[in-house]
Structure formats: C-alpha cells, structure tokens
A protein has these predicted regions:
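Short intrinsically disordered, low-complexity coil segments enriched in acidic
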Residues: 1-5, 103, 200
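Mixed-charge, low-complexity interaction segments
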Residues: 40, 55-56, 60-63, 70, ...
Length: 200
C-alpha cells in the first residue's frame, strides 16, 4: 500500500508505514498512539477487518492531495492525510467524490483547510496524537453536512493549534522564497482558479 500511495496514478509522495498505520488506527476508532498496549489482538483484528475501507480511504485521500497540487516536494506534513482519509471514510466517499460536481464545494472547503494547516507553522509537529484525536472526535460527530471546517478549527485551537495568522506570520509569508516548501501552499491561496493538479 505504501508504494501505491506514493507512486501510483502519477502520484509522487513519501508517505511512510507509520502514516498508514496511524490512519488505520484512526479509521478503526482505537487509540492512535504508538504504544505497545494499543497493539492488541482485538485492535489488530479491527484493522484487518477494516483494511479494504482503510486502503480505499487512503488512496482517495492521496489522490485528493494530488488534485490539490501537492507532492513530496511541497507537502510539508504527511500526517495531514490522516484526517482527510478519516473524513472520506466517514462519508463513505467513493471514487466519484474526487470529481463529482455535487461535492465540489466540499472538496474546496477541505482543500482550503488543508492548505492553511500546511502554511501555518507548528500544526502537524509536536502533540500530533492529541491533535489527530481531537480532529477525529469532531469529524465523528459533525461530518454529515460536509467537512466541518469551523468545528475542526475550534478543536485545533483548543489544543494550541489555531489556524489564525497574526501580522508577524503574514509578514513572514510575504517573504517566502521561490521553491520554498510552503510557497506553493501560499500561492495556491492567492490563485484559487488554477488547476493545481497540473505540475508547475
């Protein structure tokens, strides 16, 4: 699955087995921390039983990231795929979600959230398990009417991962250099009409 995520269908990512396992634990609704006590026979049976859904959600999430214009060159946090895959799983989203007109607004909301979370420093670093658990809890109870951006951002802010930018952060973004890791994300916000699935 890792090689398929990273290089199939034109994708170029560098997802690891750890990201796949973290996603599997998230989707099966078990404790997602990498602790020996979490890898019980019961939990691993849940992962095995849910593997087709886990695999499908991860592959669709990787395709979405590719459609958003991301690759290993500019995806600054591989962990962002975890909540995307979980959300797609909860929705029961099939391949049609990736390009259906009916889901275009939802994909755009998801893309904007992903982009802001990648532009803002410190979101996907320390405290990752707490962040992913909070996002999972919000998605589990708020995913029926599309990606719940406001609820997710509120939960993120509650654990010190606000997506609000202050003036100093905005000034820093204005000074990003060509080919910097976050430059693509900032430009994708400034030029929303571009087809970002094309490689620039």
């Amino acid at each position: 699955l890792v090689s398929e995520l990273n290089s199939n269908a034109g994708r170029q990512f560098s997802f690891t087995k750890d990201v796949v396992l973290k996603t599997a634990l998230t989707i099966t609704d078990v404790d997602l921390r990498f602790k020996v006590s979490n890898f019980t026979q019961t939990n691993m049976a849940k992962v095995e039983e849910g593997w087709p859904q886990i695999e499908g959600a991860l592959l669709r999430a990787a395709t979405l990231l590719q459609q958003f214009g991301y690759s290993e060159r500019n995806l600054t946090a591989n962990s962002v795929i975890v909540p995307i895959a979980y959300y797609l799983h909860l929705r029961g989203a099939g391949d049609s979600y990736l390009d259906s007109t009916a889901d275009a607004a939802d994909r755009l909301a998801l893309q904007r959230w992903v982009t802001r979370s990648l532009v803002k420093r410190g979101i996907w670093g320390s405290g990752l398990d707490t962040l992913l658990t909070r996002i999972r809890d919000v998605l589990r109870t708020n995913s029926t009417n599309g990606f719940p951006v406001a609820a997710v951002e509120e939960a993120m802010a509650a654990v010190g991962k606000s997506l609000a930018f202050d003036n100093a952060e905005i000034d820093e973004l204005l000074n990003l250099k060509y080919a910097g890791q976050r430059t693509f994300s900032v430009l994708s916000v400034l030029y929303p009409g571009l087809d970002l699935s094309k490689r620039f």
